[in-house]
Amino acid sequence: MEKNNRIKRKQNMKIYSLYRMLSLDRIFYYAIEFLFLTQVKNISAADVVLKSSFYALFMIILQIPATIVVEKLGTRRCTILGNIFNVIYLSLIIFSTNFEMLVLAEFISALCFSLKDISDTTLLTQSIPACSKKGEIFSKLEGRGSKNYYYINAVTSVLAGFLYVINPFIPVIFALLVTILATIMSFGFQEIENEELKNEDKKSRKSNISIISYIKELKDGFKFVIKSRRLRSLMLYSGIIWGAFCLISTYRTSLLKDIGTLEQLIAIISAIVGIASGIGANGLLYFH
């Protein structure tokens, strides 16, 4: 089994960075998202922001169920499932006709990332053999994928702006094709058989540990977070920053459009933001 696991680990580590580059987020899409929803789907700017609020709410609700699902189904299956949800999300965006369909799409998106945020990194962690440089290898592979995503996202953002002028559906369809490619790549991952995890699973079954007791442990964890001033501050800070980021990314495009900025220039500005994010991701890898 150990020899078989070595082959699986090599396979997973070989494709992870490329997979992460294509699946970290939606390439081609975000540069034209606001324009597509407001101009093509006739959704108001306020509703575009509101749908992001629904996404945040769904993510909070799904965190505990997603953890349980990953634990039950395994990291590989959940990674594949998350990417399939991503394909469904973009399909709903293309065919959406009203705000209610957008809310449904945001729920599907929350299903996607609540699973992927857990399963992707856990899959990589399990794929790296136990050694003194395990953390370094993880940071290198994860950082390389994230950095390359931001750079390729910058290039595709520019392309998306010019393609949007030709036909607004073209960049969204390209985003869907990239997501389908990432889904196909996710089938190449292998589940790592871990004897220790199997033994722990057997012990948990013998001791009749149920989902209810698991949720109780999480509640105890939340109580600890609430009592900790530092953790409360960290959660508040993260919430404010994330909310500000959503507002800025949405209203940036709205303001640029209101002052008569061309779609191509809006895409170029998004590309510059993407390049800055890539530099930041590279710096994070260096300092880590």
Task: Explain the meaning of each model-derived region.
Residues F28, A56-I64, Y150-A154, V158, ...:
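Residue-level signature of mid-helix packing/kink "hotspots" within the transmembrane helices
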Residues M1-K10, F189-L234:
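Juxtamembrane intracellular "pre-TM" segments in multi-pass secondary transporters
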Residues F36-V40, I93-F95, Y150-A175, D258-I259, ...:
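Transmembrane alpha-helix termini and helix-breaking/packing motifs in multi-pass membrane transporters
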Residues I170-G188:
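Symmetry-related core transmembrane helices of the 12-TM Major Facilitator Superfamily/SLC fold
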Residues E2-I61, S228-V273:
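Helix-loop boundary and gating motifs at the non-cytosolic
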Residues I61-T75, Y164, I279-H288:
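Helix-to-loop junctions at the C-terminal end of transmembrane segments
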Residues F107-Y150:
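Cytoplasmic helix-loop-helix junction between adjacent transmembrane helices
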Residues I84-N98, L102-V103:
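C-terminal ends and interior cores of transmembrane alpha-helices
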